[in-house]
Amino acid sequence: MSHISVLLHETVDALLANRDTGIYIDGTFGRGGHTRLLLSKLGSDAQVYGFDKDPQALAVAHQLEQEDLRFKIIHASFADIQTELEQRGITQVEGVMADLGVSSPQLDQAERGFSFMQDGPLDMRMDNSQGKTAAEWLLSIEEEALANIIYQYGEERYSRRIARAIKQAGALETTAQLAELVKTAHPKWEKHKHPATRTFQAIRIAINKELEDIEIFLPQAVTLLKPEGRLAVITFHSLEDRLIKQFIQKESTLPEDSGWGLPQKQVDSRRLKKISRIRASEEEVKANPRSRSAWLRVAERLV
């Protein structure tokens, strides 16, 4: 299945807010769907910078660099957004977006080791040039720590049973081995959901430090935004969405009033204004079932 960008027009339109110039950041370039639409709506003096760790995404991005001189790709995590941009002399931008989903090619290519639907090496690294593979990581982690991760990042109620089965099995080499092991250890299957879904999600999040990277990325993104600049983030599961929601809430809420009225300094401390929360339309879900769980949250920089 080729990659279809989720909430494509909604995200780009929210990010631009009727502008056609400025500097914009795509924190998760992927296969470039959002970036290409963004470039098509921007004038000749605009700039777009993409970030990605995935070697296959980088290959697509380098091709786009040749096609459009307004675009530059940066081989780094969006957690390094501020440092990487400052090194290039950029301290303020008009918009920052991130699509936190795993791309369809990553899921569909068995050799990437993300999918329980296809057999492949147990890898799961976004950047497969560095770090431990899922197989190596599972071998090295203690059972209790693994159970906690499966519970926390997969919201899996049978995490202890699954962790015990994984550790008792010893070295695992393929996604099919892990999926079968989880299936056997899982006593109660959810309707329309593979029993290994939550466990695979948890392991992927842990290996790639996905939630930690989001927590590092968000305050940096807001710091980079000019007043009236936009932040647009697409999430695919409740853990991600909760992080984005809580961050925007914190940055857009006034401190508690002591009863004497808030000093102007505290009123001015709010950095964001909530703009919208959008989910994929019925038409989009029908055309691309992977968009079913997607949410787009948009906020605007105040000061």
UniProtKB/Swiss-Prot annotation:
Its main location: cytoplasm. InterPro entries: RsmH, SAM-dep_MeTrfase_MraW_recog, SAM-dependent_MTases_sf. Keywords: Cytoplasm, Methyltransferase, rRNA processing, S-adenosyl-L-methionine, Transferase. It is an enzyme of class 2 (transferase). One of its GO terms (cellular component) is cytoplasm. One of its GO terms (biological process) is rRNA base methylation. Gene3D superfamilies: Putative methyltransferase TM0872, insert domain, Vaccinia Virus protein VP39. Pfam families: Methyltransf_5. It catalyses: cytidine(1402) in 16S rRNA + S-adenosyl-L-methionine = N(4)-methylcytidine(1402) in 16S rRNA + S-adenosyl-L-homocysteine + H(+). One of its GO terms (molecular function) is rRNA (cytosine-N4-)-methyltransferase activity. S-adenosyl-L-methionine binds at G32, G33, H34, D52, F78, D99, Q106. It is found in: Cytoplasm. Its EC number is 2.1.1.199. Belongs to the methyltransferase superfamily. RsmH family. Specifically methylates the N4 position of cytidine in position 1402 (C1402) of 16S rRNA. This is Ribosomal RNA small subunit methyltransferase H. It comes from Acinetobacter baylyi (strain ATCC 33305 / BD413 / ADP1).
